[in-house]
């Protein structure tokens, strides 16, 4: 859900910044918009899909894939958080016509900044439970092997 929200917010920023008029001071193009940080929500959607697949068809490969995607999502969310903080801490003056759009864009960045820790915590939680699931699978496999050996004797 947070991935879809981030993508919609990026689309809103796209519409907002595409409508800027070149003024004396130029247009406001923040670093998060140029890098498409909110568009990285696609990785969160893919990660969620892999988690659902891992719960429906549990295997070591599915759990490992879901865990690796969650780790990637954590890294991307932390990078997005850092870029957003850098964007909000620096502000160049823009022309009077674009000031309202720049101000609204900064408010959207603040909203997204509040969602990045949520994304990190969700990905961390799923990664922890993925590790627990992988360890449990390995223990179950070892237990099954020892039971087969004991039954043979």
Swiss-Prot record:
State the UniProt keywords alphabetically.
Membrane, Receptor, Transmembrane, Transmembrane helix
Membrane-crossing ranges are 1-21, 36-56, 71-91, 111-131
How does the record say this protein sits in the membrane?
Multi-pass membrane protein
Q: Which organism is it from?
A: Bos taurus (Bovine)
Q: What is its main location?
A: membrane
Question: Where is the protein found, in the record's own terms?
Answer: Membrane
Listed under GO biological process in this entry are: cell surface receptor signaling pathway
Describe the task this protein carries out: May be involved in signal transduction as a component of a multimeric receptor complex.
Q: What is this protein called?
A: Membrane-spanning 4-domains subfamily A member 13
**Primary gene name:** MS4A13
Q: Which GO terms describe its cellular component?
A: plasma membrane
């Amino acid at each position: 859900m947070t991935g879809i929200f981030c993508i919609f917010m990026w689309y809103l920023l796209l519409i907002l910044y595409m409508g800027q008029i070149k003024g004396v001071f130029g247009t406001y193009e923040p670093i998060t918009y140029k890098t498409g940080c909110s568009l990285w929500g696609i990785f969160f959607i893919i990660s969620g899909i892999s988690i659902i697949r891992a719960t429906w068809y549990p295997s070591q490969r599915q759990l490992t894939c879901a865990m690796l995607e969650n780790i990637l999502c954590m890294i991307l969310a932390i990078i997005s958080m850092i870029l957003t903080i850098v964007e909000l801490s620096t502000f160049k003056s823009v022309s009077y016509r674009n000031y309202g759009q720049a101000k609204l864009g900064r408010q959207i960045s603040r909203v997204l900044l509040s969602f990045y820790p949520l994304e990190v915590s969700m990905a961390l939680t799923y990664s922890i439970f993925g590790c627990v699931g992988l360890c449990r699978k390995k223990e179950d496999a070892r237990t099954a092997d020892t039971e087969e050996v004991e039954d043979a004797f």
